[in-house]
């Protein structure tokens, strides 16, 4: 076991030599230490964060998410009329978000988009819809796992730049909720959705892998590595895209550019 003195010496050496941050993570990307360069004292960035009180960045982020939801549906090979209808409706909702809307109006469009998107994304399985965190079926549990992994990697990148991850631009600030992480990961969620649809088709994700306790579904412990593996693979295919998006968002926020210059995260075309 490494002594505290030796650890401190190696840690200090790392901070001097390494010109870039090294994030130590768990298997689900949860950060437990950042070594090397980080901008935790970036007071100017945080002042910009706290001064911002508009709705336009959140509106653009939600527009970006709906655009990627439509692309995720386009990536499905066999397109039924039901699927094509959903793509068109999502495209129309993107256009609605070009207008300057109030927060509740944006929330309404986001909710309508979800009701169109999720039944079509998971039309390959009997499913009662997206219900976050209540674990009422195996698809929702798998989505929660994937979103948590995505959340953790975005959190790590935002920490490196010195953002106050608890202070968002769209999600309301609640005690101990990392609202900015929730904001920035929004356009990336379809990465997880599309991968889980593929896993359902390939038999990688199935009801037999779960136990049910008091109507709450839980992934069997021995199945954890398999699920983490296919979800991690999908997220890491976008590691460069995620890094560049956070980097561009940082530069955008520091320069306080027009909302039209807000970076866009794009889902890959298949």
Region annotations inferred by a language model:
Residues 1-41:
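Glycine/small-residue-rich interface belts in oligomeric ring/scaffold proteins
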Residues 39-270:
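Active-site helix-to-loop segments that bind/position phosphate- or nucleotide-bearing substrates
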